[in-house]
Amino acid sequence: MAQPPIRIAIAGALGRMGRQMVEAVQADPRLALAARFHRPDSVGDGLVSRDEALAMADVVIDFTTPAASADLARVSANRGGPALVIGSTGFDAAELADIADAAKTVPIVRSGSFSLGLNMLVGLVEQAARAFAPEDWDAEIFEAHHRHKIDAPSGTALMLGQAVAGGRGAELDAVARRVRDGVTGARPPGEIGFAVVRGGSIVGEHSVSFCAEGELVTLSHAAGDRIMFARGAIAAALWVSGRPPGEYDMRDVLGFDR
């Protein structure tokens, strides 16, 4: 007997990724678009309130803002569901703590990128960081996005930074250099640098360079269309539906070894 489609609600349904997700869900026979919601004052014309959407869905896919995502996680946990797929970026420590607390009650997949290729890049970067001694190999992360992106470095760039730091057995916050300006002095060993570009309609470009005396290794990924993020979010929604509570990421969804 065929399984019934998983009921999906889309948060931020009028945003760029929200509109992309609506189209992708409607095109997938494994899913049913149960509800769309946006801001509290955006109801009607096919949009419902957040509370109505949560009651109608098995999984909510959320590409909104850090504050909205953290609040959504709290509300979902308080009512015992539904599961969440969160693609928002730019969270502060308190918002991340709220999501982690909610994940004790409901299953949540949160990722800075839902691209399969990008998540493969994260794994390769971590392997390279383990192999390249920080005393000899400097790590630099570059990212570029469209002019409308409001956080920097991007969530994906921070994922890559975490991969470098994790491969080296370090804490990213202790070794990250997010800004360089003026007379900065010589680069300390083990530092992880970030460079950011914002302009035009760039969907997303990321690279990690390991620089040693006489050689340079660069691993990179470029996004040409937001549909790849939608495909990854759908894979996450299919995977997380029916899972036990916990905070998961795309490595769990894709079955990558830790």
Swiss-Prot record:
Binding positions ((S)-2,3,4,5-tetrahydrodipicolinate): 146, 155-156
Disulfide bonds: none
Keyword Transport listed: no
Pathway(s) per entry: Amino-acid biosynthesis; L-lysine biosynthesis via DAP pathway; (S)-tetrahydrodipicolinate from L-aspartate: step 4/4
InterPro entries in the cross-refs: DapB_C, DapB_N, DapB_N_CS, DHDPR_bac, NAD(P)-bd_dom_sf
GO molecular function: 4-hydroxy-tetrahydrodipicolinate reductase; NAD binding; NADP binding; oxidoreductase activity, acting on CH or CH2 groups, NAD or NADP as acceptor
List of catalytic residues: 145 (proton donor/acceptor), 149 (proton donor)
Function statement: Catalyzes the conversion of 4-hydroxy-tetrahydrodipicolinate (HTPA) to tetrahydrodipicolinate.
Name of the protein this chain belongs to: 4-hydroxy-tetrahydrodipicolinate reductase 2
